[in-house]
C-alpha cells in the first residue's frame, strides 16, 4: 500500500463548488483534484441563498416529519432520543452573559454551548412536530443572547469558541428564520460583530503563530462559522471566503493539508490520512465532523 501526496496528482478540469465540497461524503474526492484546478479563486456564492440551507434544508425537514409520523425506524428511535434529552425541553431557561471566556481565568463558555444546543434541539422539535412551545423556547434563547452577548475572549481558545459555537449558533437561528418574535436582524448583528471578527482574524493571523502551528480543527471550525454567517446574512463575500480557504488556504484546514496523504487502491477505495491522525481519535474525528459540517452547508446551497 503506497502513500501518495495529493500535491502530485495530475490536474483536472475546474469543478463547481458542489463537485468539490461533496467531500462531506468522501474527503478523498477533493484530493483527486490537481493543483491547477484548486488554485483558482472561487466565485462560489449562489445568486440567491437557499433558506433553510445549512445543515438541514426543507427536504431534510420534510423527510424527518414524514418518517417520524409514520413511526419508522431508525428515524423514530432517533426522534425519541432527541425528545428525551434535557436540552430539548421547552422549559429550558437561557443564561446569557455579556462576555464569554474560553481559556484562562473565569471560563464560562459552557453557558453558551449548552444554550446553543437547547436552541437547536428545540428548533428541531418545532420543525418536526410543530409544537409551538419548542419554537417559542428556541426563539427565547436566541433573543436572550443577541440582546446580551458583546464579547468572546480568553487565551487562544477564544478562537475555538468563536468557531465552534459560531456555526452551531447560526444553524439554530437559520431554523427559526421567519418565526414570530425572533429578532433575526439583531441576531445577525451579534454574529457579524462578535463571532465573525475572531473567525476572520484567526484565518488571517493564526494567533500570531506559524500558520501551520494549529491543528486542522482550528481552521475548520472558523471556516464553518464564516460560511454559516454568510448564509444566515445572505453575504456572498463571507461565503466565498470560507470556500476559498477550503481550496487554497495556507493553514492545516485547507483540504490538501487536512488530508495530506492518500493510500490508493485499498480494497477498491482510496483512503485518506487525516492531519491529526497521529494525535488522538477524539480530535481526529472532530476535525472530520467540522469539515463535514462545512461541506454539508455548501452542498445545501447547491
Feature-to-residue mapping (PLM):
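N-terminal carbohydrate-binding/catalytic regions of secreted carbohydrate-active enzymes
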Residues: 58-136
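Boundary/entry segment of secreted carbohydrate-active catalytic domains
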Residues: 50-53
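N-terminal secretory signal peptides
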Residues: 1-16, 27-43
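Aromatic-lined, polymer-binding surfaces characteristic
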Residues: 107-301
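Internal alpha-helical transmembrane segments of multi-pass membrane proteins, especially GPCRs
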Residues: 22-25
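Boundary of Sec targeting at the N-terminus
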Residues: 45-47
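Short coil/turn linker and secondary-structure boundary residues
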Residues: 15, 56-59, 70, 182
